[in-house]
């Protein structure tokens, strides 16, 4: 059983919040539940539609959405994906770069007032062949609603700093 700390002791009675789990402490098979959850609202959904030029009426026209099989506006999939991914940044905060995503699925709709949670499983890890001081981590993340229904999932590959190679000390992290 691994135990991760949330703060680093800097001196007598002085602690600093930590950002992410070290690459060296991650192992395939570990599952991280990301908290807190995040409730999604129609206001941000309509704004996201406008910001991203998503003109699908099902996201912001309640009268149109009422005539569909869903009966109400759907939360934009890219907003759902963004929220679910952002939830994992606290755990995987020692990331140097996102290398890619694949197998993105949106198996169930998200609606105004739904609360999203996410969890990530470590699938594999290895040292980077091209970037000394970095490791490559592959995770599978699922976004779930308040009923435990999977609404989003994807596999993501990240480049993480190894201990002693990160820029955090210089930035007072």
Where does each model-flagged region fall?
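Hot-dog-fold acyl-thioester-processing enzymes
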Residues: 2-100, 152, 163-173
């Amino acid at each position: 059983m691994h135990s991760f700390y949330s703060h680093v002791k800097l001196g007598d009675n002085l602690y600093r919040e930590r950002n992410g789990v070290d690459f060296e402490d991650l192992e395939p098979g570990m599952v991280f539940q990301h908290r807190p959850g995040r409730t999604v609202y129609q206001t941000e959904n309509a704004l996201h539609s406008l910001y991203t030029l998503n003109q699908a009426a099902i996201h912001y026209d309640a009268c149109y959405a009422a005539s569909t099989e869903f009966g109400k506006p759907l939360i934009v999939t890219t907003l759902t994906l963004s929220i679910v991914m952002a939830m994992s940044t606290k755990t995987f905060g020692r990331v140097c770069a996102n290398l890619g995503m694949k197998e993105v699925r949106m198996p169930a709709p998200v609606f105004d007032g739904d609360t999203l949670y996410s969890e990530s499983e470590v699938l594999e890890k290895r040292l980077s062949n091209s970037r000394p001081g970095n490791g490559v981590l592959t995770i599978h993340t699922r976004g779930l609603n308040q009923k435990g229904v999977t609404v989003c999932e994807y596999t993501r590959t990240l480049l993480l700093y190894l201990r002693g190679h990160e820029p955090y000390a210089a930035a007072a992290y």
